[in-house]
Amino acid sequence: MDDESKPPAPDLFEHFARTAEAVAATTKKLKKAAILGEYFATLTHDDLARAARYFAGQPFALSDARTTNVGGSILSAALMNATGANAEQLSVSYTRWGDGGDAAFEVFSAAKLNNLPSLTLVRTESLLARLSATRGKNAKTDLLSETLSRATPLEAKYLVKLLSGDLRIGLREGLVEDAIARAFHQPLTEVAMANMLRGDIGEAAVRARTGRLHDVEMRLFHPLKFMLATPASDLADIARTMPGEFLVEDKFDGIRAQAHVENGRVGIYSRTLDEISARFP
């Protein structure tokens, strides 16, 4: 068996990336969930939490206010620094694939850097935290360039996808919840409830593995995931969906907000779970 076919160590980001490739290769939801579940079972508790968030396209838990603030210009500059590609080459790749991660894979493959897999899930978490704490475009670019210069093409592909906020492998948060439930033989409703109450699919995954889904409670100033409306074509459609009695009311324009209040302290959170208290008097 050559090195290419050997599965990488579970804690490596390369293993995460190969699993993502396998998920992307099938359109069957049950197969996607099975692939994820098999991978999740190989991880430590901490790496399970990290991987669950990353597969949901979340660099940080939804309840975590941090963001990386890494946009397309920083990603492009870092990719060029790491590979020696020029702006035209990167633009051609992006136009061909329409995805930053796929473009990264192409320019990294062309560069033939011969890097070995070395990025771990914990070092990925550290990089994301440092990017969040770093101020200034140049400083962020230098930090990301340093990591990418040691990356394999597959590591670069999925690091760029993660920083973009969407892996684009036919996977949504609900399917990650389903994979967690199947992997650890827990009710999907309890996994989803834990994720909603904590705003952290990583914590929900660890609780599912350790059998601690039942004791999840809401915490003030830790926002809950919002329940979003489901569109209906007409009243008959609503009646079919909700055969019992129901009320209908006008929808008012505005924002969805969540208010947490205790002992004079007020926290207001947006539908993306960001704190927006300072925007209100």
What spans do the regions from the language model cover?
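N-terminal nucleic-acid-engaging modules of covalent nucleotidyltransferase systems
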Residues: M1-P281
